[in-house]
């Protein structure tokens, strides 16, 4: 579980907003699975869109900026110039989101690793579909059998 309270100074997330909107900041969070039994950071992107772009009353981020922070800025930084935007000739990696319904689910402990290994899992609501390279990989929370993605190695 990710403890956002560590940044909840003085009863406010304002300091996090300052970090998020700094021109040199990139939004990202992952331990690459190293702590799957003790940390679940899967809701970070859902929280950014639901809290900072929809629910926040002061200093709300425009939804376009939140999406850009999660997509184009990171893609450009990594040199992935065929991602992060919708345009002719680019990869069609897309999420269709119902922003009104978007919310992180409850954290669950599941035993689905080899040798009955445990991990924390957190699903989300409000993602209507996900496409990778133009192929549907999830619809209404159900993962399809399609696997059009491939490993990206940065030089």
Question: Could you say what each language-model-derived stretch is?
Answer:
Residues 60-64, 138-139:
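Acidic/polar loop patches that form or flank catalytic/metal-binding clefts of enzymes
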Residues 1-60:
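Active-site neighborhoods of metal-dependent hydrolases
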């Amino acid at each position: 579980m990710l403890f956002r309270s560590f940044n909840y100074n003085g009863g406010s997330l304002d300091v996090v907003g300052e970090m998020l909107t700094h021109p040199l900041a990139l939004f990202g969070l992952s331990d690459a699975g190293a702590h799957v039994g003790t940390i679940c950071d899967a809701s970070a992107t859902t929280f950014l869109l639901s809290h900072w772009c929809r629910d926040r009353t002061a200093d709300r981020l425009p939804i376009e900026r939140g999406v850009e922070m999660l997509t184009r800025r990171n893609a450009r930084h990594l040199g992935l110039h065929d991602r992060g935007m919708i345009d002719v000739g680019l990869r069609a990696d897309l999420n269709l989101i119902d922003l009104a319904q978007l919310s992180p689910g409850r954290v669950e402990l599941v035993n689905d690793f080899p040798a009955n290994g445990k991990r924390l899992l957190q699903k989300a609501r409000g993602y209507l579909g996900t496409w990778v390279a133009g192929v549907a990989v999830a619809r209404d929370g159900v993962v399809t059998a399609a696997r059009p993605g491939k490993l990206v190695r940065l030089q």
